[in-house]
């Protein structure tokens, strides 16, 4: 009876009677996800694509392992005894201080003002990174022309959840059992969006059998630009608001950031084929002429000068409440 191997990155079924010391190729380390890069702690290869990460061939040989790893132990949470409400109250006398009336807001400019492209300042680190990418991409194109569409023996299937490798022409006729969705990691749980079988163990997640049948995908076709989400945050000082977009190797000639006094439109092309778009209705008012964009190898910083040195409650202006609108309609 064939057993499932639980070694990381293996997931093959094996016969215990024929199991040998070099039958399994696996990763003895743990998965590492850092700054959008994915890899294993036991080897140096890194990738930004999750399918490529799953297809990274193991770096160690050994025996197949049929023992399922134990679930991670959850910490025991002990609750203290409930205390009387009087004990939780502060031991000093409370004084309620009335807040001062808010300063009257300045008149907000119209959002229909013409948009202006902000100045792009390109760092030396980004220029060096793009020069290296151009050299490597040129070598890859030459290599692709030589290889044409030939599939090499041992190539892993690019479908999510499939661990099969190309063995020859017979592999073209095999049925592929894979996950058609995308991997989701949320609050310690791991699962595929297509079938939602949740687990907290990464090895169990990798060993989940696919829920869709089809053909193997041995090569990835170029689908052109792909709009993707990108991690971003913001901070402010007395006179500036800065938005940081963590997109690596952005392309200045294809990217743009435009704004007027109250609106900001961001379009960034990075890593050759990825796009990030974000439109922001700003909470406050900015001075467009004194605002600019700094592009580095690891991120883009949008530096916006405040029209007045005041604290912003948030980056975006909240949408008007529907209830207030309905109330106004009924009073008319």
Swiss-Prot record:
Start and end residues of each stretch annotated as Interaction with HSP90AA1 and HSP90AB1: 65-316
Domain CS as annotated: residue spans: 227-316
Gene Ontology molecular function: metal ion binding
List of residues binding Zn(2+) 3: 157, 162, 176, 216
Full protein name: Cysteine and histidine-rich domain-containing protein 1
PANTHER family noted in UniProt: CYSTEINE AND HISTIDINE-RICH DOMAIN-CONTAINING PROTEIN 1 (PTHR46983:SF4)
Domain CHORD stretches: 5-64, 157-216
Entry keyword set: Acetylation, Chaperone, Metal-binding, Phosphoprotein, Repeat, Stress response, Zinc
